Amino acid sequence: MFKPEKIVKIEVITLTRFRDTLLTYLHEIGVAQLEEVPIKEVQRDTPNEFYRKATSYSITLSRLVDTLKQYLPPKKGGFKEFMFPQEKPKKKYKYKGIEALIKDVETFLERVEPEIRSLESEVSRINNEISSLEDTLESLQILSNLNVEVEYLRGGSFLNVDVGLVDREKAEPLIKEISDVVEGRVHIVRKDIGARTLLVVVSLREDSSKVSSVLAKYGFEKIEVPEGKGLPRDLIPIYTEKIKEKEKELEEVKSRGRKVAERYYDELVFYKELMDNEREKGNYLSYLVRTEMTFGLLAWVPEKDVEKVVEGIKKITGGVAYINISEPSKEEIDNVPVKLKNPEFLSHFEMLTEMYGVPKYNEIDPTPIMAFTYSFFFGFMLTDFVYGLLLGIISALLVKGHSKLKDGTWKFAKIMLWSSVFTMTLGILFGSYCGNALDMAGIKVPRILDPMEQALTVLMIALAIGLAHLFTGYLLGFIVRWKNGDKKGAIFEQLSWLLIIIGITLFALSSRLGVPDLIVKGIFGIGLILFMIGEVLANKGMAVLLVISDFFGFVGNWLSYARLMALALATSGIALVINILVEMIWGIKIASVPLGALIGILVLIGGHIFSTAINALGAFVHALRLHYVEFFGTFYSGEGRKFEPFAAKREVSELEIET
């Protein structure tokens, strides 16, 4: 807690024949972050033919999965599935090496791929035929405006026939220009259809190029005349029936596709996951160095997992391995990957810290402080017992439903569960139960503070909380800088603000505490002098401008905590409006039917659910902002390098490694 997980560096050199099994072992336990070995004049490892095949088969399997996915029955989904998702069962695979795995995949694909490709090809063919028939049907519907049999619209040995559409305003000049170009050797049938005009242009074969040139000039859209004989309107039922037959044929093929998906989809996903993980392993081979008989790797490993890693390496290699374990050097500190370490009941708040950025290896992890202050700020802004209870119930259900998955939803729900406790507690202190609903119902509610009637007091409390929050940040910054040897920064950039905040606090409390003015002014003055010296040392000629800018920046950050009061008032205000609206319509009756009461109950429940949602969203965003902008700005950079282990991603598969 407060410090990241202790990380050590492991360097391994062993025989090349152990490479595949060793990489697979490290990939499956997922506790080591592989790094590129920092040696320039050395040969790098490269993917062999089996890893290249894994990449190719990963792509092939992905396409086959996408093909069959469309034939699966629709997922149940819905609210229940979101709240209580089912964990996918995992199928075991005995891993005997990548060569054996590739052979198994090839055998599987030889059996499955032709059938799926055939299905895909057949569906594509039928869809193309249906599309072609629909185009023909559309053409017939247009041509049915002419009382001309289709065989006369195709032309012949001596005559050329062009049938198509043109914008109505272009029809007249088009007809005139064609007639002029071919010197009247043309016959044109015209039929206006709304804003378009249907034209049949009959010309001599020898004039076809001249006619085509004019038609193109006016944007003539040619219509392909369908096969068959008779009037277009007589052919429409025939083509409609053909489309129905093709759609029936397509449905039969899709029915077969559903059976194929039922047989093979799960296996495809299983082998795809196996290939995806082999593909990822292959991508890391360039991190390794090798000779003709040996290879070397470098990894960062949490200290608590070192024993497991070393035991696995020794077991796989039979002890034929050089293993060097060392702590990060001073030069490596900034490059050490950071894994946050907090008690289980705080670990879910790491998600909020990581959203901003992890600390450097030698910096403080703000998660424990953020866990309390974030939940408190959230509760202060939402500040209603019933709203907190509703949020807590939903969060508890999500925590239970996602407990096996331990996914992002589970972490977020745990954060909201903590926040709901603070919301209910502060709701009791402020006497807020759906706003003033109980007061309006004639029930006297005890409260320490009413944000609607004592807004100025709530504002003073919010600013006091903000000052304490900023003080904590500067104090943490002072500790980190002093410990890391940056004493100048600790004094001029952190201690200066600590003294200024102490001076402001003593000034505000001087009348109650009886602190002499000399002490108050002395502490504030020393802080201000240190701050100004720090600005001069850091910015030289620009110091005068930046002193003013940075000081008022601090004041702005402090005043930003007024949003605690503002959102608390907003929550109470929205709840008050809902309650007044319910009171206004409650007494309405129509023929002795208490319609107002029925509508009032709906408005009361729906309104407060909406108020909970909108105000919880505001509390979530603004509580984050107070940490990311105001609090972290005092001491925290978030410029660390997150620990990203070399780890398999498994949802449906599980490896049993044979060494």
UniProtKB/Swiss-Prot annotation:
Gene3D superfamilies: 1.20.1460.20, 3.30.70.2170, 3.30.70.2750. GO terms for molecular function: ATPase binding; proton-transporting ATPase activity, rotational mechanism. It comes from the Archaea. It is a multi-pass membrane protein. Pfam families: V_ATPase_I. Its main location: membrane. InterPro entries: V-ATPase_116kDa_su. GO terms for cellular component: plasma membrane; proton-transporting V-type ATPase, V0 domain; vacuolar proton-transporting V-type ATPase complex. The chain crosses the membrane at residues 376-396, 415-435, 460-480, 489-509, 518-538, 542-562, 568-588, 590-610. It is found in: Cell membrane. This is A-type ATP synthase subunit I. The lineage of its organism: Archaea, Methanobacteriati, Methanobacteriota, Thermococci, Thermococcales. The gene is atpI.
